[in-house]
Amino acid sequence: MAAMGPKTEQMSHRAARSPFNRFKHFPLALCLSAAAMWLGAPRSGVAQVSYVARFSLENPTYLAGEPIFCKFTIQNAGTQVFSFSYRTPSRALNPDLESEPRFSIRDQQGRSLPDPAPKPCGGAKGTTVYGSVRLPPGQTHTERWLLNQWAGFSSPGRYRVHAERRLPLLAFDVSKPDISGPPVAYALAINELALEIAPSTPDQLQKAFQPYLKTLEKRAGPEAGEALLVLATLPQPFTLKKLAALARAPAAKRGLDRQQALEGLARLGTREAWEEILKVARGLQAAPPNSLPAAKPEEDSLRAYAVLLLGEKGDAAFLPALLEMLPSASETPRGEALRALGLFNDPRANQALFETLRSPAANDRVNSVLGLRNLGSKEVIPALIATLSDPDAQVRQVGNFALQGLTGQKIRLPQNASPAASQHTAEQWHAWWRKQGADFTAIQLPPCRDW
């Protein structure tokens, strides 16, 4: 069905007692498509922005543990070229971004399935980089979204998917290189879809993953990126070697997101998977001497991400390796290791953080302060107050930031504060600590991920 006219959006809805009864009376997908908005006054010869947009499932039945893709299509049904934002279809950390699809999944009893997405660290919603798509009249654009990123279909049964998207459409002007400006219309798609999950055997599941494993042999192109997303979202014991190989591949040869491969190993969660992450953290996949100049920063960034995962896991078995790498690691993984030490809540880690507060390197002192903040203990308050006397201005600012985060107090340290002003702020903190320290409970940071 379609609604025609300026800024018109219509959708019919049929009430039903059971969430699945509606599918007995009309097609499985409740499709909303619209043709909306003329540019200028509605007169003959004026180009019209018109579209048809919908979600659909590729199959009615899937095996338990199998990747489930929901397809989004938009067709330019008008006479005006339009553009819209586009990126590789993977779930964004920020759910409030305007162009992103939204999925909610319920079981046969109407219960919402748990959302497996990680909570934004420290409340940050992250950023997303978009490209753009130019869609001439008559052409269709298609995206495949992996539904397993929004729900874990762990049990056989019937499920209902509510899929929704409101995509801003921009007028395309060949004389202008960018597509900035207000939308001329919004492509709205709202669909109710149903699927069934059937029991699976290990052999069936391994067969279902073979196309993705074969695609990853190419290590390039959007198909390989989609295959890696599948393995990282739904890791299986038989995908361990492939994920480990992708994570440890030299930067110049990878062509794929190695951090995503590390996430897949962490999500798999076996002892062997975590050992592979530890190897990356220790730099055992270091770039060869004749690698490109950009390789070492990329390797350092990858090592730092592996260290972060180890910290989020918080297993004391990883702690000796992190402590061992502190003296020799380069700045990026070393800084991540110091911050991660606070996540272990272990006396050995705490001692290393307190000792590093006396490091001659200001960056080390900054990261030690952040590590103590991650510890989330009132015992670190005196040491953090002492950082307000540090000779480095950044250390003082980060120290005050950590104190605010631990206590909830709004004692401010002005930007570019002089040592004298910092000392005044330190005196305010000392007064607060003497008055309330005995009864104070530190504010705990929620975990970013539960590996």
Which stretches of residues belong to each language-model region?
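Low-complexity, acidic Ser/Thr/Pro/Gly-rich terminal tails and inter-domain linkers that flank the onset
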Residues: G45-L63
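Asparagine-centered strand-capping/turn motif at beta-strand->loop junctions
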Residues: I74-G78
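The feature marks short-to-medium sequence segments in extracytoplasmic or secretory-pathway proteins
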Residues: F84-L135
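Internal, hydrophobic beta-strand segments that form the core of beta-sheet-rich folds
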Residues: H141-A171
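Short beta-strand elements
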Residues: F172-F209
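Amphipathic alpha-helical scaffolding segments comprising HEAT/armadillo-like alpha-solenoid repeats
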Residues: P202-L213, Q236-P250, T270-P293, D315-P327, ...
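Short inter-helical turns and helix N-cap capping residues of alpha-solenoid HEAT/ARM repeat scaffolds
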Residues: A220, A251-R254, Q285, E299, ...
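Residue-level detector of extended alpha-helical repeat arrays and alpha-solenoid scaffolds
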Residues: A224, R254-R258, D300-R303, R334, ...
